């Protein structure tokens, strides 16, 4: 059975095909055994293929379908009280400035490092607020996942379209 951290690992693997488990765990703020376990679960689910030389390749079609339509149901959002933290969903930096993006949602991952106020949401990865500073592209993907998990129909469709573009760019870049 997949765990929430597996979603972050899957999104990380889109751009980091042959990264070591040590590097992945440092970037995501998880243990090496958690990173390895996530890749094993993702492989069992048919969302990645382990490479003989190390690392894993994302199965783009199934992974995109899972992100777009499975994650919002498998990992329903856990809303928290108002908090100060790191913006997520459409309140995330860079997402609300898209020309055809829906109005931003005031969602934050609670964190002492954050400077935004809003409704708290439990992140898929406990270290997600710190991940925002370490890997801005992964932060954008995790924020889009939260938009899928919490947004209205228009917001979800916008997030799906952006994910299609991200997965297509990753597919082209990995060939």
Predicted regions and their residues:
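Short alpha-helical segments that sit at the start of domains
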Residues: 1-12
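Generic structural signal for hydrophobic core residues of well-folded globular domains
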Residues: 13-16, 42, 145-151, 163-166
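Short acidic, hydrophobic short linear motifs in intrinsically disordered regions
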Residues: 17-28
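Short amphipathic alpha-helical interaction segments
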Residues: 29-44
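A short, conserved structural fragment
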Residues: 43-54
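Accessory beta->alpha helical hairpin/"wing" motif in late/C-terminal subdomains of nucleic-acid enzymes
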Residues: 52-69
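Exposed, interaction-prone assembly regions rather than primary DNA-binding/catalytic cores
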Residues: 74-159
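Long, compositionally biased intrinsically disordered regions
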Residues: 157-175
């Amino acid at each position: 059975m997949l765990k929430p951290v597996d979603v972050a690992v899957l999104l990380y693997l889109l751009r980091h095909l042959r990264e070591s488990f040590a590097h992945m765990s440092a970037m995501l703020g998880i243990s090496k055994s958690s990173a390895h376990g996530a890749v094993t679960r993702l492989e069992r689910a048919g969302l990645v293929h382990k490479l003989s030389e190390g690392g894993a390749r994302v199965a783009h079609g199934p992974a995109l379908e899972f992100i777009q339509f499975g994650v919002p149901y498998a990992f329903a959002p856990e809303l928290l009280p108002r908090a100060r933290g790191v913006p997520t969903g459409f309140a995330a930096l860079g997402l609300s400035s898209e020309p055809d993006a829906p109005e931003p949602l005031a969602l934050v991952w609670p964190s002492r490092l954050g400077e935004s106020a809003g409704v708290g949401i439990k992140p898929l990865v406990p270290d997600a607020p710190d991940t925002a500073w370490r890997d801005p592209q992964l932060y954008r993907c995790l924020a889009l996942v939260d938009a899928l998990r919490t947004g209205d129909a228009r917001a979800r469709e916008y997030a799906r379209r952006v994910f299609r573009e991200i997965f297509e760019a990753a597919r082209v870049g990995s060939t």
